[in-house]
A protein has these predicted regions:
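Positively charged n-region of N-terminal signal peptides that target proteins for export
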Residues: 1-4
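Bacterial N-terminal signal peptides
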Residues: 7-15
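A residue-level marker of the well-folded mature domains of exported/periplasmic proteins
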Residues: 19-211
Length: 211
């Protein structure tokens, strides 16, 4: 996804054919929901790729897993009149209105990794999370031989990958009455949170076969 992200953005803006105009500047705002390691790498690759094109400026702001911060960040980019906005939404419901606001003002919006709750954006770059959930469900069925109890640790409640992966998992397990989701907890996409909740659940549920 990261490899082709900026190319998609530049194509949307028409920059690839107009960068020869020395005095033309394009300002891209990036609103990241989090600052984990793979997002740092994504940010680095976006900035690095932008260096190959004259007149492209990239500014990145990180919400640190806080939807209020992200709403402020996106409004900041709107006020700065960015030429294009890239958003990795923290929570779909909370961030949807401000993304729609940017789109309604004529700012091209590329939504990455996580979706919003409407189609008022220019493009989406991300995975098929329902299919990922189904694949995990099928792996569980094969691994447990169709019988057992599992603990599901989701991503941040309210983020579309977490919702869609849970939906895909549940769909895959519908035809498997021998497999029970004994507990489902919100790991918030954070290893420390997920680890703490997993330890707590496993202490009280010794019969869980798979996490």
């Amino acid at each position: 996804m990261k490899k082709h992200l900026l190319f998609l953005i530049l194509c949307l803006m028409g920059i690839l054919t107009s960068c020869s105009q020395k005095h033309t500047r394009y300002y891209i705002g990036v609103s990241q929901c989090s600052d984990d390691e793979w997002r740092h790498k994504m940010n680095h690759e976006i900035v690095r790729e932008a260096l190959f094109y004259d007149g492209v400026e990239v500014e990145i702001r990180t919400a640190k897993d806080n939807s209020r911060n992200q709403i402020e960040d996106i409004n900041y980019f709107i006020d700065r009149k960015v030429d294009l906005l890239i958003v990795a939404p923290n929570e779909a419901a909370a961030v949807t209105p401000v993304v729609e606001k940017a789109y309604g003002l004529g700012i091209p919006v590329v939504v990455i990794d996580r979706k919003i709750l409407s189609d008022r954006y220019t493009a989406f770059v991300g995975a098929d999370n329902c299919e990922i959930g189904k694949d995990v469900g099928q792996y569980i069925v094969n691994r447990l031989g169709g019988k057992g109890k599992i603990l599901e640790i989701t991503g941040l409640e309210g983020s579309t990958p977490a919702m869609e992966r849970h939906r895909g998992l549940a769909d895959a397990l519908k035809a498997e009455p021998g497999i029970e989701i004994a507990a489902s907890v919100d790991g918030a996409w954070l290893q420390s949170v997920a680890g703490e909740k997993m330890d707590s659940i496993l202490q009280d549920n010794k019969d869980i076969n798979l996490v």
